[in-house]
UniProtKB/Swiss-Prot annotation:
Major location category of this protein: membrane
Ranges for the LRR repeats: 91-114, 116-138, 139-162, 163-186, 188-210, 212-234, 235-257, 259-280, 281-304, 305-328, 329-352, 354-374, 375-398, 400-421
Family listed: Belongs to the protein kinase superfamily. Ser/Thr protein kinase family.
PTM annotation (Phosphothreonine): residues: 535, 543
Top-rank taxon: Eukaryota
Subcellular location: Membrane
EC number assigned by the record: 2.7.11.1
Positions of post-translational Phosphotyrosine modification: 619, 738
Organism: Arabidopsis thaliana (Mouse-ear cress)
Sugar attachment sites: 49, 121, 150, 241, 300, 335, 340, 386, 406, 411, 425
Protein name as catalogued: Probable LRR receptor-like serine/threonine-protein kinase At2g24230
Membrane topology according to the record: Single-pass type I membrane protein
Length: 853
């Protein structure tokens, strides 16, 4: 008997030990997922508490009984190595699996037993070898994305079992051989991407008619051969990219009325396109037929009125005149290089106001370059023609701010000014320097923005040698101080040469110093304008020596100034005043990284400057201020003393400061939902679309800006890393009214994506209630902040009482209550209870107002 008790006591001890060590019951979905994370290198401290109920973990969604995982999202979690057996392969009810953006190298043998899967995303990993024919087990699969891996061998014929498949992405791998005939069994496909592989052979017979719902097809970058008739029966196609293959025949059979994007470049298509342009081409927005064997004369393009991108370069067209394109009013990109054009470049090109790229190089064009006063033009190539005469001043004046230009191998004349020898050899080879004796020697020196009248006065003065008149004009106009109404401040050559530091500037809350000797020797980097030679001297001029009149805000990271850089670039200049532990090179590397992060809902970082120990970030200016001002009726430019209301940017009119007030676009449910969804998308991109993920750390209403189209843009992302370890806790952890509960504990962890989720929840509450996070009237004396007030109402099923009266009658009250419930989820006390931002985006999309709201 004693032995029996000892045995059962030991068994009980072992059971408790196992439960404590694994934190989940063995052979449960929670156990399998926790083992998966642990063996793939993810620890409990990385936003997961393995002792908590598994259905509360980030990225996990369970069935209604909280017994089985039906969705697992682990994108960008730095998972590495081979997925072990007896982990996720045991999730018998799993419907959706997203393991994208990791370093996974191989799949387990039991992976193919997940026969309930509907969505599988393994993209952007390092999985190699052949793709198993066991994929045929996934009969319910609707989305399969294994792009950007190292798969090789043949695409398995077993794909014919995927009868429910709608989206197939196998691009950017090493798949070989031909496209399997089994693919034709997937008749529900809407999108196919097999691009950037090593596929060869011809398309299976009946390929064009096999997919009646197909809208998107990309076969680019393979060695597939076939004819235009292979695509004749695609009735629903809107996007077609077959570039870089071996297709031939006429392009006639390719075009359908539904087609909007067509890239047929780098193939062997033949024939005359002028006789083939008909109604099937009318929906085209993007057309690339470059590097084929097309012939005839280019004409009839005026029918393609929706076209934005046109590339016909490197074909075998007969010699002909420049085609009429002035009717293509939306054209942004035009490449007619090496198309055997003759005659003149028509001056009507100036009517293409949206044109950004013009390439007519390698032709037989003669005559003068017309005056092209196209505001958006950033690239021009007219090289290797027979052009003569002066390069128009309207073009020369734009060159310092262009991304690419080439006038070489013509008979043009121009004034070389201050162009470097390298630029002269590369872009003006064969042209003649025509500078008159009195020409402006600084024509191409990057200068501060001045008014049009001043530019004209200086140009006239310097080109006529009337020194006395020039001196008078310079005295009258050359030294005006830049003010808020747009007047310009300029410095004489003598004054400019005397600009030397160190420089000290003061605001109400801080004094900052730029310890540099010569302002014009400190470069300013503008990411998308590499030819601009801007210096710290230009920043001084743009901000009137960082004058208080140009101060927009005195925020947490430092003061923000408004200014215009050379080229009319409207910017907000943020001085990062807190000491950084990073070297200049490390800080520059961090800023360069942030400059590469692009998203429609992020304020773009356009450049930076390292001035001594001072780091300066340069942002695109946001015309419509920030959300805090818009919601709480503050005039643009007004700074309040509360820390959570800093970083306000202003908007001016000729009559002074403008106040949008409550009657503007903000007073509708549709607009506020748009702001919420855009901000959520920005955060989801930072958390899940960047590698490594970026934690914002200070999401608040005043960090959400509105561009000229009233689209929301999140600012200040990633700035904390520029300081290294030089920031104190108060700055790292956010602003009063937005602080997550975990940051109020004596010993708390560093910010995580879930702390951003909490802050977003507060912003969502602001949008729905119109109230500030703290120090507002919450209609209940017991509540001292917005979060506790709204959460209390939601718990009592009285969420409608919190809705801002200004928007209550502008849409569905049910949708507005759902938005408050989403905010409730985001502001949960425990980080593990909060959804991810990807999930928040999905929830907000589910309550998107209809078009008539």
């Amino acid at each position: 008997m004693g032995l029996g008790l000892g045995f059962w006591g030991y068994a009980l001890f072992l059971s408790l030990f196992l439960k404590q060590s694994h934190c989940q019951e063995p052979n449960t979905d929670g156990f399998f997922v926790s083992e998966f994370y642990k063996q793939m290198g993810l620890s409990s401290s990385q936003a997961y508490n393995f002792s908590a109920p598994f259905c509360s973990w980030q990225g996990l969604f369970c069935d209604s009984k909280n017994e089985h995982v039906i969705m697992l999202i682990a994108s960008g979690m730095s998972l590495s190595g081979q997925i072990p057996d007896n982990t996720i392969g045991k999730l018998s009810k799993l419907q959706s699996l997203d393991l994208s953006n990791n370093k996974i190298s191989a799949l387990p043998s039991d992976f193919w037993s997940l026969n309930t899967l509907k969505n599988l995303n393994l993209s952007f990993n390092k999985i190699s070898g052949s793709f198993s024919s066991n994929v045929g087990n996934f009969g319910q699969l609707e989305l399969l994305d294994i792009s950007y891996n190292n798969f090789s061998g043949a695409i398995p014929e077993a794909v014919d079992s995927l009868v429910s498949l709608r989206v197939l992405k196998l691009d950017h791998n090493g798949f070989q051989m031909s496209i399997p005939r089994g693919l034709l069994g997937c008749q529900s496909l809407v999108s196919i991407d097999l691009s950037s592989n090593q596929l060869e052979g011809s398309l299976p017979d009946g390929f064009g008619s096999a997919f009646p719902k197909l809208e998107t097809l990309s076969l680019a970058g393979n060695k597939i051969h076939g004819r235009d008739t292979d695509f004749a029966d695609m009735k629903s196609i809107s996007f077609l990219n077959i570039s870089g293959n071996q297709f031939d025949g006429s392009v006639t059979g390719v075009f359908k009325e539904t087609l909007e994007v067509a890239d047929l470049s780098k193939n062997r298509f033949q024939g005359h396109i002028s006789s083939q342009v008909d109604s099937n081409w009318f929906s085209l927005v993007y057309l690339d037929l470059s590097e084929n064997e097309l012939s005839g004369v280019i004409k009839n393009l005026t029918l393609l009125k929706k076209l934005k991108h046109l590339n016909l370069a490197w074909n075998r067209f007969n010699r002909g005149m420049f085609p009429r394109i002035e009717m293509l009013s939306g054209l942004e990109y035009l490449n007619l290089s090496n198309t055997n054009l003759s005659g003149h470049i028509p001056r009507e090109i100036s009517k293409l106001s949206d044109l950004s790229t013009l390439d007519v190089s390698g032709n037989h064009l003669a005559g003068h370059i017309p005056i092209l006063s196209i505001k958006n033009l950033v690239a021009i190539d007219v090289s290797r023609n027979n052009l003569t005469g002066e390069i128009p001043m309207s073009i020369l004046e734009k060159l310092p701010w262009m991304e690419r230009f080439n006038f070489s191998f013509n008979n043009l004349t121009f004034c070389s000014g201050k162009f470097s020898a390298e630029t002269l050899n590369r872009s003006f080879f064969g042209s003649t320097n025509s500078c008159p004796i009195a020409a402006n020697p600084a024509l191409f020196k990057r200068k501060r923005s001045v008014t049009g009248g001043l530019k004209l006065a200086l140009a006239v003065t310097l080109s006529t040698m009337c020194l006395l008149i020039g001196a008078l004009i310079f005295v009258a106009f050359g030294c005006r101080r830049k003010t808020k109404s747009g007047e310009a401040k300029d410095l004489s050559v003598k004054e400019e040469q005397s600009i030397s530091g160190p420089f000290s500037f003061q605001t109400d809350s801080t004094t900052w110093v730029a310890d540099v000797k010569q302002a014009n020797a400190v470069p300013v980097v503008i990411f998308e304008k590499p030819l601009l030679n801007i210096t710290f001297s230009d920043l001084l001029s743009a901000t009137s020596n960082f004058d208080r009149d140009t101060l927009l805000a005195d925020g947490k990271f430092g003061p923000v100034y408004r200014g215009f850089l050379p080229g009319g670039i409207h910017v907000a200049v943020k001085v990062l005043v807190h000491g950084s532990t990073l070297s200049d090179q490390e800080a520059a590397r961090e800023l360069e990284f942030l400059g590469r992060i692009k998203h429609p809902n992020l304020v773009p970082l356009t450049g930076y400057c390292i001035a001594g120990d001072q780091r300066i970030a340069i942002y695109e200016y946001m015309e419509n201020g920030n959300l805090q001002n818009l919601l709480h009726d503050l005039p643009f430019g007004v700074q309040t003393t509360d820390d959570w209301t800093t970083d306000t940017w202003e908007e001016e009119t000729d009559n002074g400061t403008q106040n949008i007030g409550t009657e503007g676009p903000v007073a509708t449910w549709r607009f506020r939902h748009k702001i919420a969804l855009g901000t959520a998308r920005a955060l989801a991109f930072l958390h899940h679309g960047c590698s490594p993920p970026i934690i914002h750390r200070d999401v608040k209403a005043s960090s959400v800006y509105l561009d000229q189209n009233w689209e929301p843009r999140l600012s200040d992302f990633g700035l904390a890393k520029v300081f290294g370890n030089g920031l104190d806790d108060e700055i790292i952890h956010g602003s009063p009214g937005y602080l997550p509960p975990e940051f109020l504990q004596p010993e708390h962890e560093l910010p995580t994506p879930k702390s951003d989720v909490y802050c977003f929840g507060v912003v969502l509450f602001e949008l729905m209630t119109g109230k500030k996070p703290i120090e507002d009237d919450y209609l209940d004396e017991k509540d001292t902040n917005l979060v506790s007030w709204v959460r209390s109402l939601v718990r009592k099923n009285q969420a409608s009482k919190a809705i801002d009266p200004k928007i209550q009658e502008t849409g569905s009250e049910e949708q507005m209550e759902e938005a408050l419930k989403i905010g409730y989820l985001c502001t949960a006390d425990l980080p593990s209870k909060r959804p991810s931002m990807q999930q928040v985006v999905g929830l907000l999309k589910d309550i998107e107002p209809k078009s008539n709201q």
